[in-house]
Amino acid sequence: MIKIENWSTEDIEKYSRLIGEAFAASPGIAETIPHDDLVKSFEIITEFYYRMGTLYTTSEKYEGFLAYWDKNTRQPLGPALHMIRRMLREIPLLNIATGSSEQYKKLYRKEKDYIAVSMVVVLQAYQGQGFMKKVLELPFAEAAKRGCPCILDTDNIQKVVKYEHCGMTKTAEKKMAHDITLYTMAYLPTSA
């Protein structure tokens, strides 16, 4: 895995759009938000993670991406405000509210540490080739090194199965609006 640094504005636009398109093609919350709004929201979120310094990719071919951080990572104010301004300016408020929730923070708040993972995605051209496991290697290794869980939320039951195949277990599920279920997944290294 490679930490993404020194992207041009064009790179950010290109890959954030591809990430948004990959999420838009998945079931779950994606089915309840207009396609263009969903793609735009992932463009904004990708830029946020890039500015935050938490965006990683599988290789220089950019097959898959994720953002991860530990429990004590503080979000820099500048990138967070930039993201909020863009969301409010570019996406209808109702669609922002529909897609936002972090169940894992509530469930794992008593843990001394954890590795939080977000935006796990394999671009459409590379799906079905085993890249999901490769995308998760780095945060799993970090969790094992620290002896803490690696956690994430997903609204996609198909991804639950894929995450389980990669070594995660489902630790919670919560019914949300629009018949969506939010699943919390955890990788628990043997030393955690």
Regions found by a protein language model. Give the residues of each.
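Conserved acetyl-CoA-binding loop-helix of GNAT-fold acetyltransferases
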Residues: 122, 128-141
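Conserved active-site alpha-helix within GNAT-family acetyltransferase domains
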Residues: 133, 145-147, 156-173, 177
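Conserved beta-strand-loop-alpha-helix junction that forms the acyl-donor binding cleft
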Residues: 118-127, 151-161, 177-179, 188-189
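A short beta-loop-alpha structural element at the N-terminal edge
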Residues: 2-17, 28
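Conserved GNAT acetyl-CoA-binding A-motif
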Residues: 113-116, 142-155
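Active-site rim helix/loop that mediates acceptor-substrate recognition in acyltransferases
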Residues: 34-55
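Helix-loop element at the rim of GNAT/NAT acetyltransferase active sites that forms part
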Residues: 16-36
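Conserved acyl-donor/pantetheine-binding loop and adjacent beta-alpha core of acyl/acetyltransferases
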Residues: 62-120
